[in-house]
């Protein structure tokens, strides 16, 4: 998946650097889809990247700051949960590997790239995901613990009791 993310970053290299990923979908490839970039509006961009096995679809928004949304933990009791932390060093290593120059992914208060969060979700599900759709509601920061919770076919990520990511998946 890092190769797909690297390919998506390369496709978007000439875009303004203040784009953030707000939706991510990952599908097992069943057709002959091809890579493309499509402007939905002046602020919304869709990027589709493929390889032999996966279709990686990103919806990006020109939005410099996201307002946090909170959800009481009692609203969504977890059946599977993993508390994780992604260090600044891990984030820097990843961004240099995929040549990600997005300033949101740099520095002491960096936002964790979507592909690293996707890896954490795959760890919780032990790679048993065929298709996943994620909506990013608030940034997940480096060097701060976050929890990945899985209930039925829903996945959520909380950081400091703020709902950051919510999505669904199929096995």
What residues fall within each predicted segment?
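Active-site helix/loop of acyl-thioester processing domains in fatty-acid/polyketide metabolism
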Residues: 1-30, 94, 101, 109-130
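A contiguous, surface-exposed recognition patch within enzymatic or periplasmic domains that forms
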Residues: 77-110
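A conserved acidic, glycine/proline-rich C-terminal tail/linker
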Residues: 125-147
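Generic marker of "main functional regions" within proteins
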Residues: 96, 104, 121, 144-146, ...
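HotDog/MaoC-like acyl-thioester-processing domains
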Residues: 1-83, 140-143, 149-171
């Amino acid at each position: 998946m890092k190769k797909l993310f690297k390919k998506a970053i390369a496709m978007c290299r000439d875009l303004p650097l203040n784009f953030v990923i707000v939706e991510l979908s990952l599908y097992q490839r069943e057709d002959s889809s091809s890579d493309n970039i499509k402007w939905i509006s002046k602020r919304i961009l869709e990027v589709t990247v493929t390889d032999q096995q996966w279709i990686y679809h990103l919806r990006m928004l020109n939005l410099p700051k996201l307002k946090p949304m909170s959800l009481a933990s009692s609203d969504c009791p977890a059946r599977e949960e993993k508390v994780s932390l992604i260090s600044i060093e891990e984030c820097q290593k990843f961004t240099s590997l995929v040549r990600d120059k997005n300033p949101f992914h740099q520095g002491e208060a960096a936002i964790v790239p979507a592909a690293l969060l996707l890896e954490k979700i795959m760890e919780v599900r032990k790679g048993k995901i065929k298709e996943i759709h994620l909506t990013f509601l608030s940034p997940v920061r480096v060097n701060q613990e976050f929890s990945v919770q899985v209930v039925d076919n829903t996945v959520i990520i909380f950081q400091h009791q703020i709902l950051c990511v919510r999505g669904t998946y199929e096995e």
